Amino acid sequence: MELVFKHVNVEVDKKLILNNVSGLASPGELLAVMGPSGAGKSTLLNTIAGRIPLSSGTITVNGHSITKDLRRKLCYVLQQDIFFSSLTLRETLQFTAKIRLPDKMSNEQITSKVDEIIQDLDLTRCVDTIMGDVWMRGLSGGEKKRASIACELVTDPVMILLDEPTSGLDYSTAFSLIEMLRSYARDHNKTVVTTIHQPSSSIFYQFHKLLLISDGELAYFGDTGKVVDFFHKADVSMDSHYNPADFILEKLKEDEKTRLKIVSAMDQMRNSSNWPVKLRSSEDLLDDEIQPETAPPADIMMEQPYNEKDSVRVSLIELDKTDDNTQDQKWPTGFITQYTQLTLRGFKTSKSQIFSKFKLIETVTLTIIVSLIWFQLPRTEETLRDRMGLLFYMGMHLGFTPLFDTVIAFPLERMVITKERLAGWYRLSAYYLAKMTSELVLILIQPLIFITIIYWCVGLNGVSSYYATLGTLCLHSLAGQSVGLFLGIVSMDIRKGMTQATIYIMVTMLLGGFYTRSLPVWLDWMKHLSFQWYTFSALLYLEFYDGPDLRCAVRTAVSESQFSTCLDSNSTSIPSSEVLQFYSINYPYWTYILPLFAFIFIFRIAGYFILKFKQKPNQAK
Ligand SMILES: Nc1ncnc2c1ncn2[C@@H]1O[C@H](COP(=O)(O)OP(=O)(O)OP(=O)(O)O)[C@@H](O)[C@H]1O
Ligand SMILES: [Mg+2]
């Protein structure tokens, strides 16, 4: 499809970032957008992709203004490669294809599409390698970049926008990437627009067209091969041994006088007959638009004569087709597909976190130590405090670990989600529900192992109380995770999140009912804000309700029992129920459990809405 942007002005915060920029990109060709840093290259790409609004000017594709549907048919490869690091390249591509290709495509079709792209982008060697990140070795920089491009190509986009695809790559990798893009554009008749920083001259001449921006103004648009000539004519000449790409950028940055010379030479050219008809001012264009296909391509500037009527016609048919298919369909796939695919991916990513070596070591070490410390605890008044300590500790470990893990994990996950949501892959609700589902099973595995071993090693109340304790602590873990997710969403940054989480945890712990059971009256209400308090109360209930009696403390000269039963009568044991009374656990079990559900739901729902409205991803920066 032919992309034409004319007289594009973009203003951000009252600052004119793009000033009357025009250009076009034709199917089968590569357009390079170059300019010094801060010139407005990314802004131009963002504007074409529809992520920054135009202040004035027009952007059309085959003569039609870009609609939302059409925008879904163009792809945008961001400068950073953002992925879930633990997934392999094939998993990543399969997920992308399944969530972005229409539901009616069969699995075989999707797989063959993915295979085709893996071939096209020469990624066969690393399909089973994990994506990796700074901590985990995975794909190399160049492979990752190609993976980013591959993720965009699965949908067979009509146009490909790339922001600095070669930065961070060595010369030969960069060269082969651009060469690959060039042959892809030619073979599949795609329009490719890419910003590029400091290309070598051989990379530079791979591009058919060049658009130069300087301080938001157009400094050149036309054939790449003619830019040096243009500079000559503008009275800015180049030594013969120079790399033209270095030369033009150097000149644009040299001083204001040279820059103005170039910009005004460009202005002159825009008013000359050399300037493409399609980029002329709007009055000229009105005649032109009546018959967009038959308009003579009267531009001498184009090196190859404009002979791609056929391709234009083909893509116009394509355009009609897309209009039919996706007119009122906001998402490429239905909710169910999105939910299923996101759940599967969520399962894979959280599996690698939860079953990681470190997690395993943590669980095993803590389980062993706790079992040894409290092994077969005698049921006596003297060890009452130990028993409570154990119950409190279980709550602390199983509540705060998921809380911390989530606070740390979410900001990284958010980057991927933001990228995908900006490109309109799926609904937020599908993602959020899928996240809850995929993590549910995994988050409960840890309590299951931990509690089962410890409960019987220590010798707590009994079988039915074991199951209830397990259930309570699973809810407790979920409540901790909900709070963590909420804090992660609110802070959006690991360090801020950790600080908030630490404050919350410390306060929650103090109010949790173990360190002090008699808070000052004016502070007492605050314990209700602590999910640890509810869990601890519920655990005490389960341990002492209907449990075996406790042996009274041995009376000595300096101490005696705290329980009246032991003091008054000759009884040597304390009924469990008296312990409950002593610690003011006076309400039925469910009154301690219900608030945990409230914690789970309120924090998750609040997190969803904050994600949806407050932290709306605005720009891909
Ligand atoms: N939200 C914003 N508010 C104010 N100024 C902005 C905003 N976004 C971008 N700018 C400014 O717009 C100009 C162009 O930014 P842009 O990111 O498009 O540059 P660039 O050409 O891509 O640079 P680089 O080569 O360094 O990536 C810069 O001067 C930048 O500071
Ligand atoms: Mg940029």
Task: Describe each region flagged by the PLM.
Residues 152-153:
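ABC ATPase C-loop
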Residues 68, 81-91, 104-105:
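Conserved catalytic motifs of ABC-family nucleotide-binding domains
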Residues 49:
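Helix-to-loop junction immediately C-terminal to a conserved catalytic motif
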Residues 160-164:
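Catalytic Walker B motif of ABC-type/P-loop ATPase nucleotide-binding domains
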Residues 1-15, 19-22, 27, 36, ...:
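Topological signature of polytopic alpha-helical transporters
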Residues 178-180, 190-204, 212, 371, ...:
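Alpha-helical transmembrane segments and their short interhelical loops
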Residues 171-173:
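Helix N-cap at the start of a conserved alpha-helix in ABC-type nucleotide-binding domains
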Residues 372, 386-457:
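Hydrophobic alpha-helical transmembrane segments of multi-pass membrane transport proteins
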